[in-house]
């Protein structure tokens, strides 16, 4: 059985994100993408447009001193959505993040048009980034 094409789309996205290849990310994110990062911390918010979304991504690496490290557990996809079961670790100002989370993407015309970052313990995530 072959993977759904949107599984491959996520794999390309993940490879570009983890290597900091924003040029490759530009190929998978719609110019009008919207990124939702819940919580009450310096990287929370609704980021409208690819440029704002990428700036939010960059801030994760900046604030963690480059230690932010996501790993993939599984990827589920259909024609309109991608759900990735994830885990992340990071260190910042003597604090450690070690937590599961879910990424949800809405896909249209082969591009990521909207995304959500959902953590198992948002309060701990807020404390880490604050």
Stretches found by the model and what they are:
Residues 27-80:
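A solvent-exposed, acidic/Ser-Thr-rich amphipathic alpha-helical stretch
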Residues 78-88:
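A short hydrophobic beta-strand element
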């Amino acid at each position: 059985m072959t993977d759904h094409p949107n599984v491959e789309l996520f794999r390309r996205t993940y490879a570009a994100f983890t290597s900091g290849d924003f040029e490759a990310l530009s190929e998978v994110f719609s110019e009008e993408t919207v990124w939702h990062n819940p919580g009450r911390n310096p990287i929370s918010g609704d980021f409208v447009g690819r440029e704002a979304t990428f700036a939010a991504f960059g801030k994760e690496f900046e604030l963690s001193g480059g230690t932010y490290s996501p790993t993939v557990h599984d990827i589920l996809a259909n024609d309109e959505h991608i759900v990735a079961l994830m885990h992340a670790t990071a260190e910042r100002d003597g604090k450690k993040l070690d937590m599961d989370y879910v990424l949800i993407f809405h896909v249209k015309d082969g591009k990521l048009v909207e995304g959500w970052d959902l953590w198992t313990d948002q309060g701990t995530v807020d404390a880490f980034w604050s």
